[in-house]
């Protein structure tokens, strides 16, 4: 998991459960512990997160992990919280750039069927770029995401965080499809979310250097075309 030097702004609705810190040094150590726990999640799954293992990974005394996180449940929950914050920061610029690119595409097209298809293709290109970028450059993030999703089936404490994590992406997708011309952006966003999750899971099972881009784009294009069918048929 890529380390982040600066602590991201707390995503709305997320709170930490571990011991609060007031000094910069203490916050850095707490952050180092959580980042170490994230690396373990990627390597060994959530069940590999134990105080001793995290202390060893973070190169801190065992007493440090138990000081900030007396309960292993708090450590796992706060690790997931950090993961969600990192994701929100990591992909925010992509969605901002995508909205700008899509807006420029729409500005230079008309309402004809030909340009409607062009809009579908542009939307597909952006969605494909998003998925391929995550599969090629953020595999650790996606592996951690899969591990936390599985753990949510066992650990009810993580579910509210999982729903927030899902909602952040859905919010971006709703805005994206509304701008693309969807007549039901909320439903389309949820359907696209499920397609993206499926495509990413399949992609994680492949070598990142030999991803089947044609198949990935084909899945996404078909979904976008169905969603924006009314735009193409004008």
Show which residues each predicted segment covers.
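Hydrophobic alpha-helical connector segments
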Residues: 91-138, 192
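N-terminal positioning helix adjacent to the helix-turn-helix/winged-helix DNA-binding module
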Residues: 29-32, 36, 188
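Amphipathic, non-transmembrane alpha-helical scaffold segments
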Residues: 26, 30, 80, 84, ...
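Amphipathic alpha-helical packing segments from all-alpha helical-bundle domains
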Residues: 89, 134-180, 190
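Hydrophobic/aromatic-rich alpha-helical bundle segments in the mid-to-C-terminal region
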Residues: 159-167, 176-234
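N-terminal intrinsically disordered/low-complexity leader segments
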Residues: 1-28, 39, 102-103, 231-234
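Helix-turn-helix
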Residues: 32, 40-82
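A short, mixed-charge helix-start or loop-turn motif at secondary-structure junctions
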Residues: 15-22, 113, 130-131, 155, ...
């Amino acid at each position: 998991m890529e380390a982040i030097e600066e602590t991201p702004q707390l995503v709305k609705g997320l709170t930490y459960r571990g011991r609060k810190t007031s000094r910069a040094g203490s916050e850095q150590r707490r952050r180092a512990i959580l980042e170490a726990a994230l690396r373990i999640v990627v390597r060994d799954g959530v069940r590999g997160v134990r105080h001793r293992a995290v202390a060893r990974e973070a190169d801190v005394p065992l007493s440090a992990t138990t000081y900030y996180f007396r309960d292993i449940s708090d450590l796992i929950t706060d690790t997931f919280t950090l993961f969600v914050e990192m994701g929100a920061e990591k992909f925010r610029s992509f969605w901002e750039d995508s909205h700008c690119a899509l807006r420029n595409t729409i500005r230079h097209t008309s309402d004809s069927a030909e340009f409607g298809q062009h809009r579908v293709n542009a939307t597909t290109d952006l969605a494909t770029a998003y998925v391929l970028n995550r599969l090629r450059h953020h595999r650790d993030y996606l592996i951690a995401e899969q591990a936390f999703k599985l753990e949510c089936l066992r650990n009810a404490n993580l579910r509210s965080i999982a729903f927030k994590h899902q909602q952040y992406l859905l919010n971006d997708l709703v805005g994206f499809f509304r701008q693309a011309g969807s007549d039901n952006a909320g439903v389309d966003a949820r359907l696209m979310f499920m397609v993206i999750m499926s495509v990413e899971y399949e992609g994680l099972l492949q070598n990142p250097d030999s991803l089947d881009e044609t198949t990935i784009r084909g899945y996404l294009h078909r979904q976008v075309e169905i969603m924006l069918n009314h735009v193409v048929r004008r």
